[in-house]
């Protein structure tokens, strides 16, 4: 079933097309990502990412990472608890375009210095045609 509408930035061949649920393994990939992230398993965690990743943080900052940069992701943390609440994978109808998923979650990070970071998150996770994460856009409260 069709629903929603892709508008995009500027006119392009996909502008105005409906969105459909995607079934390219995005749900399983995000569940695996969460498992690796919570275990702070660098090797498994980095396998989910493309060679280059754009991360737009909830605080308005944009970070461009190479996959090799992600090996340092867990360095400041004692523990991480990312709890997935929902995963909605979508793609533009009648295209072979990259897909994305809306992910609602909570996350608690405990730093090695004892400081805690706890947020409710809404993230848009973008997958390239190879099924690797190529971007993330994060909102928090």
Regions found by a protein language model. Give the residues of each.
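Short beta-strand segments enriched in hydrophobic/aromatic residues
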Residues: 49, 105-109, 123, 140
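A solvent-exposed, acidic/Ser-Thr-rich amphipathic alpha-helical stretch
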Residues: 42-93
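Short, low-complexity N-terminal intrinsically disordered segments enriched in polar/charged residues
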Residues: 2-39, 47
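Short beta-strand edge/turn micro-motifs at domain boundaries
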Residues: 1-11, 118-141
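Ser/Thr/Gly/Pro-rich, low-complexity flexible regions
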Residues: 37, 51-52, 134-139
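A short, structured loop/turn motif at beta-sheet edges
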Residues: 92-99, 112, 126-132
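Short, cysteine-centered beta-strand-loop-beta hairpins and adjacent loop/turn segments enriched
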Residues: 108-118
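A short hydrophobic beta-strand element
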Residues: 97-107
